[in-house]
């Protein structure tokens, strides 16, 4: 997301990546958004993540929020910019796993490679299939490519 934000020319923007696992996580996300607006009144606040995917209108209705972006759209080059308040598609229509960008690990000792996204189980207690979509696997060639890139950058 950082690369996409920089490429789009977003200068004074804050991206809030929300969680929907519990009501408390959503409450904390809304609290964080309100605090960020107080601390950075001129910043563009963009909300994404699972809670935003599931309840885009709830976040778009917050006066502090400038844009709500879905889980698929946050990885698109132009997904973070635009004047429409809500840019969220039907996650169940996504058939492929977006290329996971290997970024943001420069100062870290660990990095992660995404191999799968979504879930096909419909456990009665779990919201993940509705926030992340159906199970989609990254191709083995893409996983190997990502691992090789990390190894060449010094990760073990």
Where are these regions (language model features)?
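Proteins enriched for Cys/Gly/acidic motifs involved in redox and nucleic-acid/cofactor modification
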Residues: 1-156
């Amino acid at each position: 997301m950082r690369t996409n934000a920089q490429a789009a020319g977003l200068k004074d923007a804050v991206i809030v990546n929300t969680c929907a696992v519990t009501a408390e996580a959503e409450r904390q996300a809304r609290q964080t958004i309100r605090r960020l607006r107080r601390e950075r009144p001129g910043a563009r606040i963009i909300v994404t993540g699972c809670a935003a995917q599931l309840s885009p209108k709830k976040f778009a209705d917050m006066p502090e929020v400038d844009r709500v972006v879905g889980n698929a759209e946050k990885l698109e080059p132009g997904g973070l910019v635009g004047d429409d308040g809500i840019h969220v598609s039907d996650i169940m229509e996504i058939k492929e796993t977006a290329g996971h960008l290997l970024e943001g690990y420069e100062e870290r000792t660990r990095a992660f490679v995404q191999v799968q996204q979504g879930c096909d189980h419909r456990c009665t207690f779990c919201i993940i299939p509705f926030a992340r979509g159906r199970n989609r696997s990254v191709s083995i060639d893409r996983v190997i490519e990502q691992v090789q890139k990390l190894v060449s950058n010094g990760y073990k």
